[in-house]
Amino acid sequence: GLWKNMLSGIGKLAGQAALGAVKTLV
């Protein structure tokens, strides 16, 4: 449903942000 799609989108954004942060730190 809508919530699942929203959570999925947020998860993807969070994952990309985490990867970016890790790359900058490392």
UniProtKB/Swiss-Prot annotation:
Domain of life: Eukaryota
Function, in words: Has antimicrobial activity.
One Pfam short name: DD_K
Expression sites (tissue/organ): Expressed by the skin glands.
Organism: Phasmahyla jandaia (Jandaia leaf frog)
Location in or out of the cell: Secreted
GO biological process terms, semicolon-separated: defense response to bacterium
Protein's name according to its UniProt entry: Dermaseptin-J1
The family this protein is said to belong to: Belongs to the frog skin active peptide (FSAP) family. Dermaseptin subfamily.
